[in-house]
Structures are given as structure tokens and as C-alpha cells.
């Protein structure tokens, strides 16, 4: 299991309990979500990434309890979205649902709720800094923040976000590249969700086709190639699958070296065929 070099140790890759495992209705525990997280833990994932907005923190909590993995061995991330006007309450609710005394990483899920509710980003970040001081979270960061959003936050912050989590794959590289470079210049780790989007959502497109053409060259899967591409850019990949064999593939993505020419070609093809799946404001 790789560990990111900068800041608090962040296990790589992360298992994302996000839109693919979204809980659509409140009520009984969704065993499909529970079992997916348990399978991820059994396969070897120790970094679990979830969020308030997905409605499945309780399922993650059940999975953590049933898997019986020592809490000290895990790295748990969650995010606040709807309740940015009361972050302490949102944090306590996430902790309750997850059945844990602390989060390893807590993120502001998006800057958009601050604009919609006319709450200064600085106010939300101050609450995150306060949460860090309580010990209920061990590090704090943001998600889906653009360069202007980060600049606004950094004007008044006393603590730099440890992480900015964004959609990251070749087909958003045009918009993501300057943002990644900005974050890295400030010592902010970039995590990337949706790293397999070209394979899942544009399977006949040029990025997917080129990725698949590399399988025989490197003797690895297309999944591993795109995860490796993200990591080669200094981005921690966050991926999701319900298939145990695919989970093992993901955990073994760093077993080979991508040639620079192939890294560059994936980026070039992505820039030429831009396709964003989530958080459209990131292109604004």
C-alpha cells in the first residue's frame, strides 16, 4: 500500500463510496453498499472516502464494524456539503453515522453551497480549522475548489488545506492541469475521483481506445493504466468498484512504469476530447 509523501500519511489508492454507491432512499441499511465496503477492506483498501451528501455514511459505519479492522489501521475521509452553515453539527452527525470518534480527513465538498447560501468561504474554513483543533478530525481540506476559490480561502486561512479533491482523468486534463499545478505550488495534495471515467463513460472514445491499446505493451489492465496515469501526475486516485478482482487490480496499479510518451499522449488525447462528468462549475 503506497503512502503519499506530503503531509499526513494518506494511503493510496482510496476506495470511494460515492455516486456509484449513492443511497437514494433513507430507511433500512443497504446491504449492497455495506458488502461493497467490506469487500474493499478485505481486498486490502484501508483508505475509505465517503461524504454526507451520498447518504451512505451509516452503511460505511456498519461495514467498518462488521469488518472488524482496527480503527488505527484505517484512513477515513468524509465531507460536508448541505450543512456548511453548521459544520460542527454536520461533523458530529457524520461521526455518529460512521461509528467513529474521529475522521482522518474532513473536506468541504464544494464551494457552491457557500455562494448559494451567501456564506463567506473564509467562515466555513474557519469552522474547519476549529474542528481540527478539537481532535475530531486529524486533517482538513476541500473538494471541487477552483483556483479563485482557493485564493479566496487562503487570504484569511491560518491552516492550508491538506487536500483538494477533484475529478481527474485525461479528459478533464485541460482544466485540471493549472489547478493541480497551483495546488502543488501551495503544498496542497490533489486527490482525483473518477479516474476511470474515459473507460466507463466514453468507452468508444480515443482515450479509452488508446488506453486499451497499451494493455499488451505493459501486461496490465486498462484500469491500472489510468490509475497509474493519474498518479504519474502527482494525484492520488480514488476509485470505486464492486468487483473483488477489480479491487485487487486497483491496489496493484503501481506495479509498472508508464513511458513518458504514453503519459503525454493520454494527456493530449484528453485535452482534444474534453468530457467532464461531475461538478460542471470546474470548467467555468
UniProtKB/Swiss-Prot annotation:
CDD domains (UniProt xref): AKR_AKR3C2-3
GO cellular component: cytosol; nucleus
Residues making up the signal peptide according to the UniProt record: none
Pfam families in UniProt: Aldo_ket_red
GO terms for MF: aldose reductase (NADPH) activity; alpha-keto amide reductase activity; alpha-ketoester reductase (NADPH) activity; indole-3-acetaldehyde reductase (NADH) activity; indole-3-acetaldehyde reductase (NADPH) activity; oxidoreductase activity, acting on NAD(P)H as acceptor
Active site per database record: 54, 109
E.C. code: 1.1.1.190, 1.1.1.191
Claim: Coiled coil is one of the keywords in the record: no
Taxonomic superkingdom: Eukaryota
Keyword tags: Cytoplasm, NAD, NADP, Nucleus, Oxidoreductase
Catalytic activity: indole-3-ethanol + NAD(+) = indole-3-acetaldehyde + NADH + H(+); indole-3-ethanol + NADP(+) = indole-3-acetaldehyde + NADPH + H(+)
Site (Lowers pKa of active site Tyr): 79
Annotated NADPH binding sites: 49, 143, 165, 196, 201, 239-243, 246
Top-level enzyme category: oxidoreductase
Intracellular or extracellular location(s): Cytoplasm; Nucleus
Family: Belongs to the aldo/keto reductase family.
Assembly: Monomer.
Descriptive protein name: NAD/NADP-dependent indole-3-acetaldehyde reductase
Amino acid at each position: 500500500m503506497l503512502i503519499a509523501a506530503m503531509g499526513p500519511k494518506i494511503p493510496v489508492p482510496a476506495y470511494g463510496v460515492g455516486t456509484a454507491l449513492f443511497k437514494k432512499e433513507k430507511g433500512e441499511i443497504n446491504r449492497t453498499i455495506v458488502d461493497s465496503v467490506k469487500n474493499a477492506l478485505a481486498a486490502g483498501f484501508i483508505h475509505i472516502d465517503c461524504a454526507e451528501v451520498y447518504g451512505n455514511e451509516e452503511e460505511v459505519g456498519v461495514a467498518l464494524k462488521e469488518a472488524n479492522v482496527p480503527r488505527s489501521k484505517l484512513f477515513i475521509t468524509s465531507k460536508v456539503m448541505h450543512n456548511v452553515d453548521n459544520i460542527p453539527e454536520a461533523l458530529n452527525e457524520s461521526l455518529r453515522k460512521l461509528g467513529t470518534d474521529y475522521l482522518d480527513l474532513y473536506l468541504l465538498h464544494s464551494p457552491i453551497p457557500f455562494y448559494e447560501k451567501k456564506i463567506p468561504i473564509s467562515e466555513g474554513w474557519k469552522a474547519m480549522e476549529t474542528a481540527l483543533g478539537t481532535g475530531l478530525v486529524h486533517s482538513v481540506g476541500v473538494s471541487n475548489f477552483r483556483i479563485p476559490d482557493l485564493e479566496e480561502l487562503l487570504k484569511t486561512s491560518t491552516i492550508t488545506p491538506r487536500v483538494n479533491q477533484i475529478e481527474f482523468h485525461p479528459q478533464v486534463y485541460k482544466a485540471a492541469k493549472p489547478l493541480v499545478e497551483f495546488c502543488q505550488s501551495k503544498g496542497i495534495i490533489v486527490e482525483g475521483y473518477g479516474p476511470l471515467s474515459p473507460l466507463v463513460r466514453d468507452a468508444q472514445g480515443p482515450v479509452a481506445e488508446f488506453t486499451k491499446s497499451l494493455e499488451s505493451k505493459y501486461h496490465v489492465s486498462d484500469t491500472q493504466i489510468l490509475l497509474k496515469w493519474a498518479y504519474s501526475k502527482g494525484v492520488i486516485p480514488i476509485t470505486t468498484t464492486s468487483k473483488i478482482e477489480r479491487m485487487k487490480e486497483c491496489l496493484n496499479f503501481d506495479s509498472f512504469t508508464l513511458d513518458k510518451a504514453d503519459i503525454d499522449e493520454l494527456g493530449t488525447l484528453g485535452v482534444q476530447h474534453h468530457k467532464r462528468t461531475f461538478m460542471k462549475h470546474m470548467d467555468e
